[in-house]
Swiss-Prot record:
Residues 17-148, 179-339 form the VOC domain. Pfam families: Glyoxalase. The keyword Iron applies. PANTHER family: 4-HYDROXYPHENYLPYRUVATE DIOXYGENASE (PTHR11959:SF1). Its EC number is 1.13.11.27. Keywords: Dioxygenase, Iron, Metal-binding, Oxidoreductase, Phenylalanine catabolism, Repeat, Tyrosine catabolism. This is 4-hydroxyphenylpyruvate dioxygenase. The lineage of its organism: Eukaryota, Metazoa, Ecdysozoa, Nematoda, Chromadorea. GO terms for molecular function: 4-hydroxyphenylpyruvate dioxygenase activity; metal ion binding. Fe cation binds at residues 182, 267, 350. Expressed in the hypodermis and intestine. It comes from Caenorhabditis elegans.
Amino acid sequence: MTTFDKGAKPDIGTFVAFDHVRFVVGNAKQAAYWYCANFGFEPFAYKGLETGSRITAQHAIRQDKIVFIFESALLPDNSELGNHLVQHGDGVKDVCFEVEDLDSIIAHAKAAGATIVHDITEESDADGSIRYATLRTYGETDHTLLERKNYRGAFLPGFKAHPMPATFFKTLPRVGLNFLDHCVGNQPDLQMDSAVQWYEKVLKFHRFWSVDDSMIHTEYSALRSIVVTNFEETIKMPINEPATSDKKAISQIQEYVDYYGGSGVQHIALNTSDIITAIEALRARGCEFLSIPSSYYDNLKERLAASSMVVKEDMDRLQKLHILVDFDENGYLLQIFSKPCQDRPTLFLEIIQRQNHEGFGAGNFKALFESIELEQTKRGNLFYDNVKDGNTK
């Protein structure tokens, strides 16, 4: 595991934080409801036929500082969203960052050769105005850069209060997720470095953390990962790629690439200050998470006993809930991973709690990979010999 110095502050505008994540899905209304019922969000903003939007419907849901938007086409001839859906299935299209001084950021991005999907645009309503531009990053994933200092509304121009009452969702156990911790992008083999260089060159992000396949591997598969972040280190974007296996096994990263149809967002990590309460609530709501064997916790207890680190959470409850623990001399983190959120084995969510620990669970990667490999085996996707032309032998 390697960490990096962030260097001098870039001479362009500021990347403030994650603003929201936009998904392209087959049915935005149903997807929004599913995430609300399962993961503790509540509907809060809407754009569709009733608000004057004739092309797409967008349902925005929120939990504390986390905002997801689900977008679907309204008309059958919408080839942009239609083609995206056929190629990738339900998935993340846009990871939006709030920024300050949009002009300088976009001027630099253009000079660096970035693909500009939408140049700087201003939109307004009775609550003020926003300015934004959209860049293409890896695959067909975009980053919208949003300047909202002159906007006083609840979300964005054109959105109205969501018509779906939150009464039912308020009867379910409260989850308590607080903010978006990091957003992970998977790349085909040997494309991680070019994706990382895009963030360094176009957005002036810096490398924060990395691991390679000598550290992260199982008997069957491995990965390499580099985390990039803005100068303030409020936006963290891990970039993964698979490592080749001599056992003809399919890495979980490669499985994602195969089923998503290329590079894309693999998972979104949501931060909580009380992961035990959060996971108990999520399981009560029906969320499914990866299972971790008891041997992992036996080994964890031995490693903790040989260290000076004290985990204040009850280990028996962590084990019962299948929550993973990683630690170093400074602190620890607790994390758990959902099963895929759609039929394709692509996007999933991570729930994470940090106690003075800024890593990404490198000590848990082996246990996580082995758990995912069990799921791949159930899907018939662990070995190339079992898969041919999309069909399981």
